[in-house]
Regions:
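N-terminal alpha-helical targeting/anchoring segments
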Residues: 1-139, 154, 158
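TRNA-recognition modules of translation machinery and tRNA-sensing kinases, especially anticodon-binding
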Residues: 27, 135-433
Length: 433
């Protein structure tokens, strides 16, 4: 969400940004919010004048009532002033109700206007225009056929999607045995990896209030992702970023405590009602998964430095697991409305001979802070912090990349050295079938 003052002073820049994001249908919102803002400021100005006059008129009534004891003619004048005081009070009540209504209308529109993207963001309508920046690690081109990832898991008796379908429907799975151990090992390794980078480990709430949802994401994202608890003001989180950033709602953060660097574990729940939907056969896009997340709350001048550092953490972690990756700069049309800048980290799939998304690092500027009324108190006053997020690792997508890149010709799966302590010293997984 932008500052209304910024929109007021830079309407053309806001319109141009909307065009860069290929959201021309939102262009009328700028004029709408400016008209409402002008109407609201007029109401506020009139209300302030009435409040200022209220005390003066009240004093005048008191003075006239005192004079009326000696001069009865003053009583009529006092009653006239009393009538004016009542009329002003009635008008003030009308104006205050109008201000409340206008503020709600303005906020509703403001929540739909996208954040100003960074000048470095490539311009394009959708993810087909995302730009490859660099690659890390040599892509594996095996001389043997790599099965589909669920077939690899099934060779270890490690997954049962049929049973999950009977219990929960499509988009769920049972992980078992070595694959379940591997899943937990990757999460534990990712947790310790971030702790060693200086991040504070946290397990957050897995359900959040509606005002937190509104504060961390757009309505479009909310409709496509979030499960609501029936009869409660609670939503299941789609990522722990939601509850981690929500931790600071309505809070004043001491400047000396910045940056806040947090890494969190949580299950994640998603409706996946967007363009892609859930995957019919595999575990790439599903309704429930677990994830280790990283979140940073920092000074505005430090956010781009943290952005660079955070996506590099993802690259370092994936490379430590012998998975080649590449960085992809997200274009304007692929950025969610709150994002200033974002890049995807994609892992190499030897089976498909192409890369696929496993992480998305995002700088949201002060958008979430403004929505959630977060403030930082420093020597020069208060200001809005910047927020950033990036998945450390999100099994089962990580498992797809891990299994394909560490699969051997005989069906065994090599366990990289960094992961072996989390697998009880196991160096190789041997298929059961």
């Amino acid at each position: 969400m932008l500052d209304i003052k910024f929109i007021r002073e830079n309407p053309d820049a806001v319109r141009e940004n909307i065009k860069k994001k290929f959201q021309d249908a939102k262009l009328p919102l700028v004029d709408q919010v400016l008209a409402l803002d002008e109407e609201n400021r007029a109401a506020v100005s009139e209300a302030n004048e009435l409040r200022a006059n209220r005390n003066a008129l009240s004093k005048q009534v008191g003075m006239l009532m005192g004079q009326a004891k000696k001069d009865p003619s003053k009583l009529e004048e006092a009653e006239a002033v009393k009538a004016q005081v009542k009329a002003n009070a009635d008008r003030l009540a009308e104006l205050e109700a109008k201000e409340t209504e206008l503020a709600q209308q303005i906020r509703h529109i403001m929540l739909q206007i996208p954040n100003i993207i960074d000048p470095s963001v490539p311009i394009g309508p959708d993810d087909s225009c995302n730009v490859e920046v660099q690659r890390f690690g040599e892509p594996v081109v095996p001389d043997f056929e790599i099965p589909y990832h669920t077939q690899i898991m099934e060779s270890f008796n490690g997954i049962d999607m049929d049973a999950a379908g009977r219990v929960s429907g499509n988009g769920f799975y049972y992980l078992m045995g070595d694959i379940a151990r591997l899943h937990e090992a990757v999460l534990a390794y990712a947790r310790d990896f971030m702790i060693n980078k200086g991040f504070t480990f946290c397990i957050p709430p897995f359900m959040i209030h509606g005002n937190v949802v509104e504060g961390v994401m757009s309505q479009t994202e909310m409709d496509a992702m979030m499960y609501k608890i029936e009869g409660e003001d609670l939503y299941l989180i789609g990522t722990s970023e939601h509850s981690m950033i929500g931790k600071f709602i309505d809070q004043i953060i001491p400047e000396e405590s910045l940056p806040q660097t947090l890494t969190s574990y949580s299950p994640c729940f998603r409706k996946e009602k967007g363009a892609h939907g859930i995957e019919e056969r595999g575990v790439y896009r599903i309704h429930q998964f677990e994830k280790q997340e990283m979140v940073v709350v920092c000074k505005p001048e430090d956010s781009m430095k943290w952005y660079e550092q955070m996506w590099r953490y993802s690259v370092e972690l994936f490379r430590s697991l012998d998975i080649p990756v590449r960085q992809l700069e997200c274009c304007s049309g692929d950025l969610a409305d709150l994002k200033v800048k974002s890049c995807d980290i994609e892992a190499w799939s030897p089976r498909q001979q192409k890369y696929f998304e496993v992480c998305s690092c995002s700088n949201l500027g002060d958008a979430q802070a403004r929505r959630l009324k977060m403030r930082v108190k420093g020597e020069k006053g208060t200001y809005l912090p910047h927020t950033l997020n990036n998945p450390v690792v999100a099994p089962p997508r990580m498992l797809i990349a891990f299994l394909e890149n560490n699969l051997q010709a005989d069906g065994t799966v090599k366990i990289p050295a960094v992961l072996q302590p989390y697998m009880g010293g196991t160096q190789m997984l041997t298929p059961k079938q």
